[in-house]
């Protein structure tokens, strides 16, 4: 057997925002398959209506979703835990929402052969006022693909120097270097 080696701590010294990895953009709410992407991440953008009270966002996200409202992370939905809804704060004005959905693998046989990735079906936003329950289905979606490939990561780092992020989260690409002098 080969001997074990140790190497110095790796510092991730370069960063490119996830938006720098966007490959294609389409109007509407689309799955990975509709956007011709097998693996990776989809960034969905929509403006949510004003709600005077907290609201519940309900969706079927395959497989893991992070939800940002007004640039702040408000929650996550994990398909493996059967999570399909989360509480949003009251929105006193129309507010931009970004939903990042990661596909976590494929099953390529049997009844799971049609395991579509991304947001599946409609999204509803449910709130209430003094007299009734109100259900919204946002329709002005933008779907952006971020393929999970080495080439796309390199493109993201090239774009990053000119990118000015407008939302406050550090989802993205990180890169560091290490020199290993001895094989192990």
Q: Residue spans of the language-model regions?
A:
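Conserved short histidine dyad/triad with adjacent acidic residue
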Residues: 45-51, 179
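Non-transmembrane functional regions of envelope-associated proteins
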Residues: 37, 68, 167
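An acidic-aromatic loop/edge-strand motif
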Residues: 1-9, 13-32, 92-183
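A cross-kingdom feature marking solvent-exposed beta-strand/loop segments within repeated
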Residues: 24, 28-34, 43, 52-54, ...
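Solvent-exposed, flexible loop/coil residues
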Residues: 36-39, 47
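Non-catalytic terminal accessory/regulatory regions of metabolic enzymes
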Residues: 44, 61, 74, 115-118, ...
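Short solvent-exposed loop/turn micro-motifs enriched in small/polar/acidic residues
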Residues: 41, 58-60, 79-81, 171, ...
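Aromatic-lined ligand-binding clefts that engage carbohydrates, nucleic acids, or primary amines
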Residues: 54-68, 97, 178-184
